[in-house]
Curated annotation (Swiss-Prot):
Superkingdom to which the source organism belongs: Eukaryota
Parts of the chain that traverse the membrane: none
Name recorded for this polypeptide: Transcription factor RBF1
Major subcellular site: nucleus
Highest classification ranks of the organism: Eukaryota, Fungi, Dikarya, Ascomycota, Saccharomycotina
Protein localization: Nucleus; Chromosome, Telomere
One GO biological process term: positive regulation of DNA-templated transcription
UniProt family annotation: Belongs to the RBF1 family.
Species: Candida albicans (strain SC5314 / ATCC MYA-2876)
A GO CC term attached to the entry: chromosome, telomeric region
An example molecular function term from Gene Ontology annotations: DNA binding
Length: 534
């Protein structure tokens, strides 16, 4: 076989087809060798295997013999490498298993935590449901308890008339703070009647004692009758005299809201018979008997305490008008004492007022007498001085007399001369200002002349004159005040024009009376000189 193979290899192809086939075979062998070499990891083994591709067969055999020694070493290295790889794979598998186990443990823990949370939520929801159920049950119990209390409260007024009478006979005491309430509830039908007379009789004689109040008719109509409590404030009465209608019981009416109503409900047969009045069985008596009055409660609540059943009824003849307190002597005595005390106080006040008026009258009369005396003395002094008098001086003396009168009431007469002398000494040191005077005010020169004449008269008589000193001081003070007012008026006018009614020949700084006197003596040009020294 080997010989045949060698022979086939040694055969040289002649044609192109055989050459191509030969190349294809060589290429296939090389590809197989390359694939086998690529599978081996050791480079020495790969180089050894690839050495067979050399073109020379003899070179390949030589290389095979040269590397046979190192083949065992490379095989051992390859085995160690494979073992190392196997160890790495085993470790990698262990790590993967550990990671997978860890993930499974985490997942299990998460599932356990989720299950615990769900259990807690379920427990909380269960607890909430139980709590709500307990609350609902408690509320139902409270509602039942309240309903029981309400039923008891409603059942308490539903007592029979005999029990009311028995309680009233055993004890007459009742709670005055608790308002009366009917045993019938609102809109409840009390009873039905066949006639209006039966209705009124029942309300007056039976329902009133049961309700422990007096029920009266508020208004009566053909198809409705309205009842109310006696204390509601207004109801019909048979007494026509207004003076007799007012009585003590009227003060007890406090607008009670207790109301009843009775309505007339005709039967259906009656309505049909009205349409056919010619029937033989129809008559008015049967229609009256067939009517039905229904008594119904509107407001069962009173605003006052119940009246005792066994109280004494007052006769109608004993009712009197409410005009004055009856049988109250103590109260009348107290009123008389208060009136007497008030009268005494008024009398005392009147006496005090009369005394004060008398004192004032006496003081005024004394002051007027003193003023008259002062005025007479001043007139005598002026006449003795020989100066011309004017009506303005009398007014000035009257004012001075009033001022001296007020000061004489406040101070004693023996202190006045010292004070007046001090004021005169202080005022004499001050220089008087030059101010224009009107027709009603005296000139400062005239006042100075009066003071000088008064001083001369005092010196000639040799006795102190109190009135002269007072007049001089008061005149000087009034002159200063008047000057200040005129200066303010002049400052406000800012030097306005002179009045056209005033004579231009008159000097505004000198008294007109003095100027007229000087004109009569021919002293017209001396005003400017005199005005500078005033």
């Amino acid at each position: 076989m080997s010989s045949n193979k060698n022979q086939s290899d040694l055969n040289i192809p002649t044609n192109s087809a055989s050459l191509k086939q030969k190349q294809r075979q060589q290429l296939g062998i090389k590809s197989e060798i390359g694939a086998s070499t690529s599978d081996v990891y050791d480079p020495q083994v790969a180089s050894y295997l690839s050495a067979g591709d050399s073109p020379s067969q003899f070179a390949n055999t030589a290389l095979h013999h040269s590397n046979s020694v190192s083949y065992s070493a490379s095989a051992a290295a390859a085995a160690a490498e494979l073992q190392h790889r196997a160890e790495l794979q085993r470790r990698q598998q262990q790590l993967q298993q550990q990671e997978l186990q860890h993930q499974q443990e985490q997942l299990q823990q998460y599932r356990q935590a989720q299950a615990q949370a769900q259990a807690q939520a379920q427990a909380q929801a269960q607890a909430q449901r139980e709590h709500q159920q307990l609350q609902h049950a408690y509320q139902q119990q409270q509602q039942l308890h309240q309903l029981g209390q309400l039923s008891q409260q409603l059942a308490q007024p539903h007592l029979s008339q005999h029990e009311h009478v028995r309680d009233a006979l055993t004890t007459d005491e009742f709670d005055t703070n608790e308002d009366l309430r009917s045993r019938y509830i609102e809109n409840e039908i009390v009873k039905t009647f066949n006639s209006k007379a039966e209705l009124v009789h029942f309300v007056k004689n039976e329902l009133g004692p049961e309700e422990r109040c007096k029920i009266v008719i508020n208004s009566s109509k053909p198809k409705a009758v309205y009842f109310q409590c006696e204390r509601s404030g207004s109801f019909r009465t048979t007494v026509k005299d207004a003076t007799k209608r007012q009585r003590i019981a009227y003060t007890k009416r406090n607008k009670c809201a207790y109301r009843l109503v009775a309505n007339l409900y005709p039967n259906e047969k009656d309505q049909k018979r009205k349409n056919k009045p010619d029937e033989p069985g129809h008559n008015e008596e049967n229609s009256r008997i067939s009517e039905m009055w229904v008594l119904r409660m509107i407001n069962p609540q009173h605003n006052h305490a119940p009246d005792p059943i066994n109280k004494k009824k007052r006769q109608k003849t004993s009712r009197t008008l409410v005009e004055k307190p009856i049988n109250k002597p103590h109260h009348h005595h107290l009123l008389q004492q208060e009136q007497q005390q008030q009268q005494q106080q008024q009398q005392q006040q009147q006496q005090q007022q009369q005394q004060q008026q008398q004192q004032q009258h006496n003081a005024n009369s004394q002051a007027q007498q003193q003023a008259a005396q002062l005025q007479q003395q001043m007139q005598q002094q002026l006449q003795a001085s020989g100066l011309p008098t004017t009506p303005n001086y009398s007014e000035l003396l009257g004012q001075l007399g009033q001022l001296s009168q007020q000061q004489s009431q406040q101070q004693q007469l023996h202190h006045i001369p010292q004070q007046r002398q001090r004021t005169q000494s202080q005022q004499s040191q001050q220089q008087p200002q030059q101010t224009p005077h009107g027709l009603d005010q005296p000139d400062a020169a005239v006042i100075a002349a009066i003071e000088a004449s008064a001083a001369a008269a005092v010196a000639s008589q040799g006795s102190p004159n109190v009135t002269a000193a007072a007049v001089a001081a008061l005149q000087h003070t009034q002159g200063n005040e008047h000057d200040a007012q005129q200066q303010q008026d002049r400052g406000g006018n800012n030097g306005g024009a002179i009045d056209s009614n005033v004579d231009p020949s008159l000097d505004p700084n000198v008294d007109p009376n003095v100027q007229a006197h000087d004109h009569s003596h021919g002293l017209r040009n001396s005003y400017g000189k005199r005005s500078g020294f005033l």
